């Protein structure tokens, strides 16, 4: 990555999709960044119990300012191209062909006598935090309830603090130290397991995209309590008739009454019409 921002020729990042994590860190090492209007940018490592480990915490605040950088690394949420342009993360949004415009941009910069900007040498966007160091504690207070007990958000903040208080190369060493602490610790392993397990749970092994759906014409639900009633309502909401099986007529009537009450409450809030209430209740019997 040092070869990118150390190049004496202009290095232009042409971003056409998502620049997340290492992708954004690579783009930050380039002298210029162009993107299409649908591009997304972010450093989501905090969701994996980590922090950006390739200079992201040191370059990002130099590009977008400390406050914006803190928001991005502690939330892990991506931002759009318009936001990236307004914050200084990218230099331009390309409307035409990205490749040809990026090449033209690089040729234009190569023909210029102006030196190519390196974020490692830029400190102007750090000044706000230098003048107001409380910005870091304010962020800590703001995210405290949501992130209590998690190490990654705090270490991300400490790295942004290092970007302000340390020379760039020292900040990189500090970032690497905290990154290794997180990577070798139990929290990141647990968060990474959770992250990938959650996505794997949405997939069913052996069922391909070409698998034909089986039409559902009617559903039977055993029990009309809290869970059974909720299942019945979900089916009725999409127009599928439901038969609830209960141990007694009394239990069945109670379950059907609760379902009607729930639909009536939803209608009173304007989310569905009274006609919808009757239609959906009419689909549920026992």
Write out the residue ranges for each language-model feature.
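An acidic, glycine-rich surface segment that forms the CoA-thioester-binding/catalytic face
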Residues: 1-16, 56-58, 63, 191-214, ...
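Conserved N-terminal Rossmann-fold NAD(P) cofactor-binding segment
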Residues: 248-286
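Amphipathic alpha-helical segments at domain termini/boundaries
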Residues: 25-29, 71-178, 195-210, 278-286
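Long amphipathic alpha-helix in the N-terminal Rossmann-like dinucleotide-binding domain
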Residues: 107, 178-189
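Generic, well-ordered alpha-helical scaffold segments in large soluble proteins
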Residues: 7, 63, 75, 159, ...
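Conserved catalytic cores of soluble enzyme domains
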Residues: 1-115
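NAD(P)+-binding Rossmann beta1-loop-alpha1 motif at the extreme N-terminus of oxidoreductases
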Residues: 202-262
